[in-house]
Amino acid sequence: MTTTGTTAFNLEMNDLIEEAFERCGLELRTGYDFRTARRSLNILTIEWANRGINLWTVEQGQIVMNTQQALYALPIDTIDILDASTRTNNGSQSNQVDINLSRISEPTYMTIPNKNTTGRPVQMFVNRQSGGVASTPQTTLVGGISSTDNTITLASVANLPTQGFVNIGSETIAYQNIVGNQIVNAWRGQNGTTAAVHLTGVSVFNNQLPCINVWPTPNPPGNQYTLVYYRMRRIQDGGTGVRTQDIPFRFIPCMVAGLAYYLANKLPGVDPNRVPMLKAEYEQQFQLAADEDREKASIRFVPRNLFYS
């Protein structure tokens, strides 16, 4: 007998939700059933982010650095940074060099006396912000700014952190200092946006982007360094009924089992005796998938011998 020769099996959201309902002993019948299941599915993927590193969400990113800029924005869906380095001669086959950035904590970063010291960056503090943009403006511009101005006068700075990011129009601006009512040492066009002209009175919004603080700050000209990092991103949202999910095929049994357990906790027609069984099945399926979704490189532990005389 011949086999199909295909390995493309996947579940669209409609089928995934229907399978989860059947495991609860129910049938998917109404539009509300679909909406409540989709909501639970999105919550489920957020839970997975709290369980550890999901290897399929690990991505590399690069940022060209600037002279004396310590603060670098990360994509808004960043959960954490796994590793980072500063690279010189980016793209050169003969002399590209990466030097690892050592991760330090916020208290350790605060103990650095002069955070504006220049040199090749060797340390980083990862500031894991929410990525949310304020829904109401914190302040407004006083006087217009060109696309190259790095000093920005505001009506008030009372509601702004002394270091961070702001959105003006469609532009994201990084800044490292506030003096009086002015943002000084601003870095324009951050996080994939373009520096633009802004008129007086325009609203200014606080943007809580996840970011990296490096030390020392890059020495001139600055752009000889490229910040190279591996990050863990969020799992993409469930989407509509004809979409497949942002997971490898190995996690399909786990996702179905997890959604069935989530639904069993809130749907009134589920037999209460099913809930412990569905929870146990979910935990087993997640453990099976997580055990496979791991690094398989060899690790060697060597004891450190210390001698006292």
List the predicted regions and their residue ranges:
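Glycine-enriched, solvent-exposed interface loops adjoining structured elements
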Residues: 1-136, 205-309
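Autoprocessing Asn-cyclization modules and mimics
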Residues: 55-64, 99-102, 129-206
